[in-house]
Amino acid sequence: MYGLFFEVKPKDGHLKNYLSEVDYLNPILSKYPGLTWIDRFSNLSDKDFLLSFQIWDSEESILSWRQDPEHQKAQMKGKKLHFDDYRIRVGKKVVKYESKKFSYFDEEKRKLESKYIVLINSTNELQDTSFTSFKSINREHAFTAMASTLDFESASKLISNFATLDAIVDATIYEVLRDYSMDDRDQSPN
């Protein structure tokens, strides 16, 4: 499984336009092969940023969605009209903590010196300076906290520090495969 993390800062006065584009694309996206889950979140420490978090079954599915003609039109509108900034990260799920147990994926392939995203889903805001906290736009009492690390050991420690809290629903570590932004396109697939 793969996580796609799209953090976006709409230009002043363009939030409604961006959300209209999202509403238009949602029916297309929901039928797209490979998408297993999506939610959008408001950033609790920086109200100007939103997070779209998606779970896909493969990188190929993500790339296919990226090439969708309607999605490409919306991407161009976003870049030219609606966005001050954005960042996209794609990561492969390597650890999942749920129901008080850890599940590991592709252990032998994991790079110890790589970037990782730690994502903790909870029913309350996680207040820790290691994380950026978000609140779901679509679901009540649904929060996610996201942290970035430069190695697997640090990512594992972050999960271990918070996994036993009552409000934690689950936690996941993603190994970052691509990380690019509006101005830094080096790791963009095209």
Give the location of each predicted region.
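Short S/T/G/P-rich N-terminal loop/turn motif that feeds into the first structured element of a domain
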Residues: 1-49, 60-64, 81-190
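Conserved hydrophobic/aromatic residues on the N-lobe beta-strands of protein kinase domains
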Residues: 52-53
